[in-house]
Swiss-Prot record:
One of its GO terms (biological process) is DNA synthesis involved in DNA repair. This is DNA replication and repair protein RecF. Disulfide bonds: none annotated. It comes from Synechococcus elongatus (strain ATCC 33912 / PCC 7942 / FACHB-805) (Anacystis nidulans R2). Belongs to the RecF family. It is found in: Cytoplasm. The RecF protein is involved in DNA metabolism; it is required for DNA replication and normal SOS inducibility. RecF binds preferentially to single-stranded, linear DNA. It also seems to bind ATP.
């Protein structure tokens, strides 16, 4: 897939800006707080319907405006599509595909897929379980759009159950029973999908980590569900029964802490290098190699599942990589993946990145083309991405 254009109206600090993407790699150059990351955030919204920065739509609407309108033109193997998201200061968002209003915004998922890599992604290694769950969930939403619906349902049941647990002194335990069953049913659906995604991702990530580390390091990614699958299987009914039993066993603790302690909202991933937990022992260089390996694995997995390459969004991260890791990334993506890159300066880049990129300067929500060393037609670009 190839993102041909993006039109932002009253989105963040963009009043009315159109950008045409004319090369497989686009570098967004500018000082901090000028709008580079905001542009990547717009692409992220089309990919996942979420922002990793804020949870409320009104925080994305430009100050003084009632709504923001984002329009993307995307080339897919099946043809060109126009996607639109309208965000409101008040009220629900509105999404369209090719002029048709979608009754469920989740139906837009899968139209434009992307993998984002920023300096914040180092939290995958050194941060808490929530960061690792969020990363896995963003991947799954693009691989299986139904996953977003499961998450919504699970979140609703979890909130209802926690609201009851907060009334521990006067709680009628019979009210928990139907919510326990729903939590187990939906929770197992989520854990099964997470488990299967990790099984497919592990060999890809391990391969890239060996390559980047010069065959010196072995990466192991292990899924740690809140409730272990019975007998090393993911058979749904048996897994649900085990989760219900664990909920019953933790009842006193849940009443004491007034929150749900069992379910996929307590899952984690264990990342280890050569048998040692990366969170505790990995150097900064090893952490960067690990996260880069995960991101390259994401790209490959999405391409394998969808049959088309996703976009790669690099948010001020290349400066965090030494030239060797930059070269590994450059060789891995070549022209297969359309790449949008933000940076404050070009000096830390491998020169081959600069020579083959479209360069746009970003200043206070305005974009200006600096150089387009290669200016092939859209058709030839799409052909190069598919070759």
């Amino acid at each position: 897939m190839f993102l041909h254009s993006l039109h932002l109206q009253h989105f963040r600090n963009y009043r009315d800006q159109t950008v045409q993407f004319q090369a497989p790699k686009t570098i967004l150059l500018g000082e901090n707080a000028q709008g580079k990351t905001n542009l990547l955030e717009a692409v992220e919204l089309f990919s996942t319907l979420r922002s990793h920065r804020v949870s409320r739509d009104r925080d994305l609407v430009q100050t003084g405006a009632e709504s923001a309108l984002l329009t993307a033109v995307v080339e897919r193997d099946s043809g060109e599509q126009q996607l639109q998201i309208q965000l409101q200061q008040q009220g629900r968002r509105r999404v369209q595909r090719d002029g048709e209003v979608l009754r469920r915004q989740l139906d837009l998922l899968g139209s434009l897929c992307s993998v984002q890599f920023s300096s914040l992604d180092l939290d995958l290694v050194r941060g808490g379980p929530q960061q690792r769950r969020d990363w896995l969930d963003r991947l799954l939403i693009q691989l299986q759009p139904i996953y977003a619906h499961l998450q919504q349902q699970y979140g609703r049941v979890l909130r209802q159950r926690n609201a009851l647990l907060r009334r521990a002194e006067s709680l009628d335990l019979a009210l928990l029973a139907p919510l326990n069953w729903q939590l187990a049913q939906l929770g197992v659906h989520i854990m099964r999908r997470r488990s299967r995604a990790i099984q497919r991702l592990v060999p890809l990530a391990a391969h890239w980590h060996r390559e980047i580390s010069g065959q010196r390091e072995q990466l192991i990614v292990a899924y740690q569900p809140s409730v272990l699958a019975p007998d090393d299987t993911d058979e749904a009914i048996a897994w649900q029964e085990r989760m219900l039993a664990q909920i019953e066993a933790r009842r006193a603790a849940e009443l004491g802490q007034r929150t749900s302690l069992v379910g996929p909202h307590r899952d984690d991933l264990n990342l280890s290098i050569n048998g040692t937990e990366a969170r505790l022992q990995a150097s900064q260089g090893q952490q960067r190699t690990l996260v880069l390996s995960l991101k390259l694995a994401e790209l490959e997995l999405i391409e394998a599942v969808l049959g088309e390459p996703p976009l790669l969004l690099l948010d001020d991260v290349l400066a965090e990589l030494d030239l060797r890791r930059q070269q590994q990334l450059l060789e891995a993506i070549a022209n297969r993946f359309q790449t949008l890159i933000t940076t404050t300066h070009l000096s830390a880049f491998d020169q081959s990145w600069v020579e083959t990129a479209q360069i746009l300067t970003v200043q206070s929500g305005h974009l200006q083309s600096e150089a387009v060393p290669m200016a092939p037609s859209s058709a030839s670009l799409h052909k190069s991405l598919d070759s």
